[in-house]
Design a protein with these regions (language model features):
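Flexible, active-site-adjacent loop/turn segments at secondary-structure boundaries
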Residues: 38, 120, 211
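Conserved NTP/Mg2+-binding pocket subregion across the NTase superfamily
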Residues: 65-175, 180
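Short aromatic-enriched loop/helix-cap "lid" or pocket-rim segments at secondary-structure transitions
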Residues: 37-38, 113-115, 206
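Conserved nucleotidyltransferase catalytic core and NTase-mimicking acidic/glycine-rich helix/loop elements
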Residues: 141-268
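Metal-dependent nucleotidyltransferase catalytic core
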Residues: 1-19, 27-38, 46-102
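A broad, structure-centric signal for solvent-exposed, well-ordered loop/edge residues
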Residues: 33, 108-110, 220
């Protein structure tokens, strides 16, 4: 993979030469001082430009960054449409480096800078950015639940548990797995994250998809959670569901006690 300095210099060298590019920023994990550095980190870069169309209509300029072996352009896709503003080129290079390069109009600079605080300014040709921007991941910190959000989490978990049971009773294992993984599990992880917050504070992030969760919970809790990912049979699914419910009940009672919230009777 390209070393950090080599790839960034390649990006900045191109940006300095092209008058249409006025501002260049780096986003994501490479700007986050709380994330361990490794060779697998993407380069999330945004070019704020005077005109986007020339870059979109002629993609030859992308070769400046390396040999592209695969690319996605979300704005050009039908099955997986873009969910963020701008126009993006998500590239995997032949040395396995991944570069996510997004084009935004420079007129949208103020709006863009308000969208995410995890941004580092690499180039500002016109001095448009007056404030000193320091990247921070505070937008991704664990958030304290309100009484309403706590109850909503409990309600969603226990209500959809009945769907998992229905799927298992009908011998529709894919239906049951889908509801456990895509509804119950996110609420269980959310509740566990609140537990972490009550114990260690709400001043840090557990990472995308809770990837740092294991560093902040007891080994026994972590192993119980991991056991719920074994869903290869109906017996395994019943066991996973029961364990998820036991975990959720235990953790949500702790969270309710900490915040002095009423513990709902949804699991009666």
């Amino acid at each position: 993979m390209n070393c950090n300095e080599t790839m960034l210099e390649r990006i900045l060298s191109f940006a300095r030469e092209d008058e249409r590019i006025r501002v260049v920023t780096l986003e994501g994990s490479r700007t986050n001082r709380n994330v361990p550095r490794d060779e697998f980190q993407d380069y999330d870069v945004t070019f704020l430009v005077t005109k986007m169309e020339p870059f979109i209509n002629d993609e030859g300029w992308l070769d400046r960054f390396g040999t592209i072996v695969m690319m996605q352009k979300p704005e050009a896709m039908e099955l997986f449409p873009a969910v963020v503003p701008g126009y993006s080129f998500l590239m995997i290079l032949d040395d396995y480096t991944k570069v996510d390069l997004t084009l935004r109009k420079v007129d949208e600079l103020d709006v863009y800078l308000k969208e995410d605080k995890l941004v580092q300014v690499l180039l500002d040709k016109d001095g448009r950015i007056k404030d000193n921007i320091i990247p921070t991941d505070e937008d991704y910190h664990i958030t304290k639940p309100t009484a309403r959000s706590f109850d909503d989490c409990c309600n969603e978990f226990w209500f959809v548990s009945t769907y998992v049971v229905k799927g298992l009773c009908r011998r529709e294992i894919l239906f049951a797995i889908d509801h456990l993984n895509n509804v119950l599990r996110p609420e269980l992880l959310r509740m566990i994250s609140w537990k972490v917050g009550t114990e260690k504070g709400f001043t840090f992030s557990l990472g995308k998809n809770y990837k740092y969760l294991d560093k902040h919970i007891p080994k026994a809790l972590w192993e119980r959670l991991l056991s719920t990912y074994n869903m290869a049979s109906y017996e395994d699914m019943w066991r996973a569901l029961t364990t998820c419910q036991d975990l959720f009940r235990d953790v949500s009672k702790e969270v309710a006690e900490y915040f002095r919230y009423e513990y709902p009777d949804y699991d009666r």
